[in-house]
Curated annotation (Swiss-Prot):
Together with the chaperonin GroEL, plays an essential role in assisting protein folding. The GroEL-GroES system forms a nano-cage that allows encapsulation of the non-native substrate proteins and provides a physical environment optimized to promote and accelerate protein folding. GroES binds to the apical surface of the GroEL ring, thereby capping the opening of the GroEL channel. The gene is groES. Heptamer of 7 subunits arranged in a ring. Interacts with the chaperonin GroEL. This is Co-chaperonin GroES. One of its GO terms (cellular component) is cytoplasm. It is found in: Cytoplasm. GO terms for biological process: chaperone cofactor-dependent protein refolding. Belongs to the GroES chaperonin family. Its main location: cytoplasm. Pfam families: Cpn10. It comes from the Bacteria. SUPFAM superfamilies: GroES-like. InterPro entries: Chaperonin_GroES, Chaperonin_GroES_sf, Chaprnonin_Cpn10_CS, GroES-like_sf. Keywords: Chaperone, Cytoplasm.
Length: 93
């Protein structure tokens, strides 16, 4: 498994629907980049004023993140995104 460092988080992307509400099938080129994912690994935390502070997200959280944030990586056939905690906008549910 990928173990992120510091304030980084590894997420597995949640793919968007392949068809519209009216039943039109969207080609890959028409789909927007996903902005939702599931946290699969969390770094050790960030350092502020010499103190280590734990991240606000944890493994299993569903999150929304900035549209162009992070670095895409493929590991053991699965696509992941590694991003910093400050690129996370919200935790869902």
């Amino acid at each position: 498994m990928i173990k992120p460092l510091g304030d980084r988080v590894v997420i597995e992307l949640v793919e968007q629907e392949e068809t519209t509400a009216s039943g039109i099938v969207l080609p890959d080129s028409a789909k927007e980049k996903p902005q939702e994912g599931k946290v699969v690994a969390v770094g050790s935390g960030r350092v502020e004023n010499g103190e280590k502070i734990a991240l606000e997200v944890s493994e299993g959280d569903r999150i929304i993140f900035s549209k162009f944030a992070g670095t895409e990586v493929k590991y053991e056939g699965t696509e992941y995104l590694i991003l910093r905690e400050n690129d996370i906008l919200a935790i869902i549910g």
